[in-house]
Amino acid sequence: MDRRVVITGMGGLCGLGTDTTSIWKWMREGRSAIGPLLNTELHGLKGIVGAEVKALPDHNIDRKQLVSMDRISVLAVIAAHEAMRQAGLSCNEGNALRFGATVGVGLGGWDATEKAYRTLLVDGGTRTEIFTGVKAMPSAAACQVSMSLGLRGPVFGVTSACSSANHAIASAVDQIKCGRADVMLAGGSDAPLVWIVLKAWEAMRALAPDTCRPFSAGRKGVVLGEGAGMAVLESYEHATARGATILAEVAGVGLSADAFHITAPAVHGPESAMRACLADAGLNAEDVDYLNAHGTGTKANDQNETTAIKRVFGDHAYSMSISSTKSTHAHCIGAASALEMIACVMAIQEGVVPPTANYREPDPDCDLDVTPNVPRERKVRVAMSNAFAMGGTNAVLAFKQV
């Protein structure tokens, strides 16, 4: 069954803001949310920057449900409710079996895991908090979204590190195309700003000491952030039948694996995923106006991605617009490509390419137009989003104007 899949609602929160309007406002302007961490439970960890959600917005999550939720689930549920409101949809007994959710989570509920560790091994406790297990499981965010909204169709978690959200969106597209659902909530959530995760990334020598500078000479690494992004996906027929406002079409999906190294990037994997995405969408390389790059700010990743883009797009690589919005919201792991989906869809909606913030000076190995520091007005009919994870799991999406 070849059904077109469209986006009719989006929700999100991250260091930039607690709804899609504020996220896009500051993303578009190139304002960075990266700064010193204010979390009081980092147990003496100093000198690490990140992008925090400093205060949660008001929400109507049931208190009985809230006690069983880790931060990743809370973020996902808040974003999911916003997406449903924008889409003008609600779930009821008549349609619940045709509504589902796929939520990408790169790390899981490490806040609950760390608290259990400290209770047992530091404080000398004998038992963990009762909901530790269900808070920490990678599928928790998807389950909590399902329960909060009453979704009874296909519901599952997706985990593939930094490409989790794009994989979740791709999986949701498949559910609709295969006829298993009419509506899917899809995206990602992660909350990595906890002591144990930050220490693990510090040990890999991957963290930047100051800020995230994708594609800029002198870039020093990744900055972690927390957040969530969710989209309402519908079959085109379902959306038009109810008179929905269509924000964009998910035109293509490209998936691949490097099969190379657990941390080091390879060119062939990202290249294959981008080529597969173009083929799935029926697009030529020249059709892409804007590419939201994976762009983590590490020397190896940004150079590798630049090479892959040149291989796929040829001369057009130098004329299309590219940017990495991780420079504004940081690397939110499982939520990263969900937030970048918001960037792509809004670029299509408003004809503005968000910039790569914090850019200082050109790197001759990253010589493409990465929209440094200043947004650019441009007609965007097709936008592509790259997500390339540690372990070499790659997921690329193409979004198209409808």
UniProtKB/Swiss-Prot annotation:
The keyword Transmembrane applies. Signal peptide: none annotated. It comes from the Bacteria. Keywords: Cell inner membrane, Cell membrane, Membrane, Nodulation, Plasmid, Transferase, Transmembrane, Transmembrane helix. The keyword Plastid does not apply. The chain crosses the membrane at residues 329-348. Residues 2-401 form the Ketosynthase family 3 (KS3) domain. The active site is at 162 (for beta-ketoacyl synthase activity), 294 (for beta-ketoacyl synthase activity), 331 (for beta-ketoacyl synthase activity). One of its GO terms (cellular component) is plasma membrane. SUPFAM superfamilies: Thiolase-like. Its EC number is 2.3.1.-. One of its GO terms (biological process) is fatty acid biosynthetic process. GO terms for molecular function: 3-oxoacyl-[acyl-carrier-protein] synthase activity. Pfam families: ketoacyl-synt, Ketoacyl-synt_C. It is found in: Cell inner membrane. PANTHER family: 3-OXOACYL-[ACYL-CARRIER-PROTEIN] SYNTHASE, POLYKETIDE SYNTHASE-RELATED. Belongs to the thiolase-like superfamily. Beta-ketoacyl-ACP synthases family. Proposed to synthesize NOD factor fatty acyl chain. Involved in the synthesis of a highly unsaturated fatty acid moiety, which forms part of a lipo-oligosaccharide that is responsible for host specificity. This is Nodulation protein E. The lineage of its organism: Bacteria, Pseudomonadati, Pseudomonadota, Alphaproteobacteria, Hyphomicrobiales. The gene is nodE.
